[in-house]
């Protein structure tokens, strides 16, 4: 269990979590409904939640730039737009369930979302709204993980929760390739960076290290958002021995 009361979290989830591999739908009704239910449970537990959502279910910037005749900058910008599409879907679904929320965009899209402002976003969280942050870091060559870490620092969250669909934490090597890969319950920021481990962008880890924000990486196929906040699941990246948040 956690040592301290968690009051504010940044939940980073991939766009892939919204899609169903068995369907051609980019956004699965079942997956979206599950996400809404998870957010409602956590909000009802008096935890303030900001969400950073990826766009990989619609388009991946780097892979698209390699496969199509599109330069990297344009491809990354297209990927950022994909996160806005997912954010709009999430915002509307939350509204349908009477969950107050604020949809924000790092880049100006006034007809679609409010321009992200740290103070306004923090105020919205304090008012019980789910804050949805789209467009990543707002610049090419920077991942959505890095954008999530930036938002986590600005909003002064207690923990950054990164949900994945393929692994249940940080391993010493890729568990999908090596059956004997070992999962860490806890690893320090510096050890994560010095060992060149994957699963989360090192730039994001560096930002969280500077701000002293722990990161919990967990499997969204195995665990709920509530479990990631209140129980010991996945891997904690922090400076605290033992992985306590």
UniProtKB/Swiss-Prot annotation:
Q: Which InterPro entries match?
A: AceGlu_kinase-like_sf, Asp/Glu/Uridylate_kinase, Uridylate_kinase, Uridylate_kinase_bac
Q: Which residues bind ATP?
A: 12-15, 56, 60, 164, 171, 174
GO terms assigned for molecular function:
ATP binding; UMP kinase activity
Task: Write out the pathway annotation from the protein's UniProt entry.
Answer: Pyrimidine metabolism; CTP biosynthesis via de novo pathway; UDP from UMP (UMPK route): step 1/1
Pfam families, alphabetized? AA_kinase (PF00696)
Q: Name one GO biological process term.
A: 'de novo' CTP biosynthetic process
The protein's predominant localisation is: cytoplasm
Q: Which family does it belong to?
A: Belongs to the UMP kinase family.
Q: Give the protein name, as stated in the record.
A: Uridylate kinase
| Species of origin | Chlamydia muridarum (strain MoPn / Nigg)
Per the UniProt record, the lineage of the source organism begins with: Bacteria, Pseudomonadati, Chlamydiota, Chlamydiia, Chlamydiales
The gene name on file is pyrH
